[in-house]
From Swiss-Prot:
GO biological process: iron-sulfur cluster assembly
GO molecular function, one term: 4 iron, 4 sulfur cluster binding
Binding site residues for [4Fe-4S] cluster 1: 20, 59, 62, 65
UniProt entry tagged with the keyword Protein biosynthesis: no
The protein's assembly and partners: Interacts with CIA1.
Annotated [4Fe-4S] cluster 2 binding sites: 177, 231, 412, 416
Family to which this protein belongs: Belongs to the NARF family.
Source organism of this protein record: Saccharomyces cerevisiae (strain YJM789)
Pfam families per record: Fe_hyd_lg_C
Top-level taxonomic group: Eukaryota
SUPFAM superfamilies: Fe-only hydrogenase
Protein name, as recorded: Cytosolic Fe-S cluster assembly factor NAR1
Keywords: 4Fe-4S, Iron, Iron-sulfur, Metal-binding
Top-level taxonomy: Eukaryota, Fungi, Dikarya, Ascomycota, Saccharomycotina
Function: Component of the cytosolic Fe/S protein assembly machinery. Required for maturation of extramitochondrial Fe/S proteins. May play a role in the transfer of pre-assembled Fe/S clusters to target apoproteins.
Length: 491
């Protein structure tokens, strides 16, 4: 290993850049302090440069770095911004606070404070209710359910269209991870047509909250929505132009929650309570706490890949789903077999190294290899025994995400349970991986599971107004192909 490369350089997840590289135009140049005779004028006062203002919108439109300058993030999306803004708004009687919390953040806080998930939930709700007079606290599962339902619907329709037209069989790519979405838009615009255009649970939750209050004749200006998310790129996601109408005012992480408690001289555990009625009392009208505080099968990032294959399996009685592991723990494929055919496949792929391989595979034009191999196997079949051998061979294969119908992509290795905003930043690589495994296990044991395929259409239909469910992709054209441009950020 090179002396210039250390283990600390291999953290392989998106973090804010240390400096902004956005080029800015300076009006006028510096005046020369030299007179007509060539003499230096020492009496001339130095010019004062204008202060440059750069916003999150500038970051989203700039291709200088992958995410954003940390300074820019903190200036508009941080716990300090929340405290300042809500401190002013709370003085107005017609304003109220709404908080949404992702399941990854709930589990991270529970693990950090040594609590059960329910105890941590109640503690968090009690804290926001008592200290900030918060009116509603919700989980993000309802937003995730609709996101999954729309994703599955679009994948099935896209696959049918490809089969009818014989179009390119390259997979669709998820856009729910803002790190991967921003990376694609800024450095790999050729992949933008492959992005499946469905918003993330964070944004759809915001849209649902806004729709709920509009149905009650409550103006958007009457509430402040704070979102608790596992990574810093969620701040950028909430600042996308098409996301501004989703009703999310500020995004913070569990790390910022802990910092905020310290600054306020508050002990999180001092808000412990056994009052489970908080789940219902802090739910908006029409929001069932058994749903929005739940989760679903398929993984801690959403389970989009798993749920798609499950949906196709329900359409084909007798089909069999198998789970295939990839070359590393950050690749998994869900493959659906029926008779001698693979009728559906979807994969999960995490970490920037795997994303780099994904980009190379999808831009090399080798998208039909597996199809040819399966056809060859089918032609060699001579009877039931051969068919059984073929099925066994397919089942024994390793994950092949590049030939899936859909790939659920996450920038962080270990996916969302390893988000940069979670309470795991001080762990070494081995302990960090063990912590992710622990949190994944707790996710399956402590959260109730609901069926997004059944609930999704019902929730969307029940919404008081049409929801904002799609992004407006903005790929940045590159004069020169870039593989990675990041300032102060090691992947």
């Amino acid at each position: 290993m090179s002396a210039l490369l250390s283990e600390s350089d291999l953290n392989d997840f998106i973090s804010p850049a240390l400096a902004c590289v956005k080029p800015t135009q300076v009006s006028g140049g510096k005046k020369d302090n030299v007179n007509m005779n060539g003499e230096y004028e020492v009496s001339t006062e130095p010019d004062q440069l204008e202060k440059v203002s750069i916003t999150l919108s500038d970051c989203l439109a700039c291709s200088g770095c992958i995410t954003s300058s940390e300074e820019i993030l903190l200036s508009s999306q941080s716990h300090s911004v929340f405290l300042k803004n809500w401190g002013k708004l709370s003085q107005q009687q017609d304003k109220f606070l709404v908080v949404s919390v992702s399941p990854q953040c709930r589990l991270s806080l529970a693990q950090y404070y040594g609590l059960t998930l329910e105890a941590a939930d109640l503690c968090l709700m009690n804290f926001f209710q008592k200290h900030f007079q918060c009116k509603y606290v919700v989980g993000t599962e309802m937003g995730r359910i609709i996101s999954i339902s729309k994703t599955v619907e679009k994948i099935i329709a896209h696959k049918k269209q490809k089969e009818n037209t014989g179009a390119d069989r390259k997979p669709l790519l998820s856009a729910v991870c803002p790190g991967f979405l921003i990376y694609t838009e800024k450095t790999k615009p050729q992949l933008a047509p492959m992005l499946l255009n469905v918003k993330s649970p964070q944004q759809i939750t915001g849209s649902l909250i806004r729709a709920t209050f509009e149905s009650l004749a409550i103006a958007r200006e009457s509430f402040y929505h704070l979102s608790l998310m596992p990574c810093f790129d969620k701040k950028l996601e909430a600042s996308r132009p098409e996301s501004l109408g989703d009703g999310i005012d500020c995004v913070i992480t569990p790390r910022e929650i802990v910092t905020m408690l310290q600054e306020l001289n508050l002990d999180f555990k001092s808000f412990l309570t056994e009052d489970t009625s908080l789940y219902g009392r802090l739910s908006p009208p029409g929001w069932d706490p058994r749903v929005h505080w739940a989760s679903n099968l398929g993984g801690t990032c959403g389970g989009y890949a798993y749920q798609y294959v499950t949906a196709v399996q329900r359409l084909h009685p007798g089909s069999q789903m198998i789970v295939l592991e990839g070359r590393n723990s950050d690749i998994v494929e869900y493959r659906l077999l029926h008779d001698d055919r693979i009728i559906a496949a979807a994969s999960e792929l995490s970490g920037f190294r795997n994303i780099q391989n994904l980009v190379r595979k999808l831009t090399s034009g080798s998208g039909s290899e597996r199809k040819r191999n399966i056809t060859a196997l089918r032609k060699r079949r001579t009877g039931p025994k051969a068919n059984s051998r073929e099925m066994a061979a397919v089942a024994a294969a390793t994950a092949d995400p590049y030939h899936s119908d859909y790939i659920e992509v996450n920038a962080c290795p270990g996916a969302c349970m390893n988000g940069g905003g979670l309470l795991n930043g001080e762990q070494n690589s081995l302990k960090r991986k063990q912590l992710v495994q622990t949190l994944n296990k707790r996710h399956g044991e402590e959260l109730a599971m609901v069926d997004p395929l059944t609930l999704g259409p019902k929730l969307e239909e029940a919404a008081a107004r049409p929801l904002s469910l799609e992004y407006v992709f903005a790929p940045v054209k590159q004069a020169v192909e870039k593989d990675l441009v990041s300032v102060g950020s090691t992947w």
